[in-house]
């Protein structure tokens, strides 16, 4: 029975701006703590896509019935900003690992756009050995830490876009490329050939893409080595960094006021799903798990609602709708 002294458990999404150094599971625990301190009833909390402790940015936090949709966030595309420092490769492919190789080469700034273009589309990528991928039931990072040699299986991922944000340039070198006569002309003042020590990129990627691996491969394609020194997720599925709130701000707000106005509705995680409006009788049938027939709607996934409140996700095929996932929201009950 609900505790009358506690606020009802919320249902929806919090978009957290996860700080660097905090794991996704730790972020979930922190939100649970904030809800308890805010006087809310026990609430189921989950996240919509792991963000490494060394990364920061958008982490969708699912509350209550929205946790039933958290898996959809795992399949959603993501957008990241990240910086590659050239010259060193580490075992973890980020700044926390041990340097395993060095290169004195730096890529020409002018060469970078053409190389980035080769990574757009479906590519084959080898995940980092320091990753959560399971190998024979064990996490790859646990095997790597124990000193085992690991062969990571390449996977197909999609890079929807990859663009340069800005670069950090070293002292300019001057081009010794030949003139039209195929040799340098001492009377011509040559333009400096700018070399990049680091570059910041923005990548829009499919599920399963490892930014650390992408950074490694971009550096290799530029004829050098590199590792990630900065990583921020700016979009996950429909959720953007403009909607995100820091954990510190969330804790401060919860001390003096309700946080309901920070919570996005459950359907915010389904912005690409068309709605199907139910009447009370069809809503009752859906809640009982019955099939709806003779619907004029197109095939595919639909969000069924009653009085603008989500009732279920329905899969329609040939005019027949079956329940994929039902929602037990308190406002649905008649």
Whereabouts are the PLM-identified features?
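Residue-level signal for inorganic ion chemistry
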Residues: 61, 82, 137, 214, ...
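Acidic, low-complexity central loop/insert segments
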Residues: 70-127
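Short, structured loop/turn "capping" segments at alpha-beta junctions
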Residues: 122-127, 154, 224-230
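Pseudouridine synthase
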Residues: 69, 139, 144, 198-238
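Intrinsic disorder/low-complexity segments
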Residues: 163-196
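Extended alpha-helical targeting/anchoring segments
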Residues: 131, 135-162
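Glycine/acidic-rich beta-strand-loop module
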Residues: 44-74, 129, 142-146
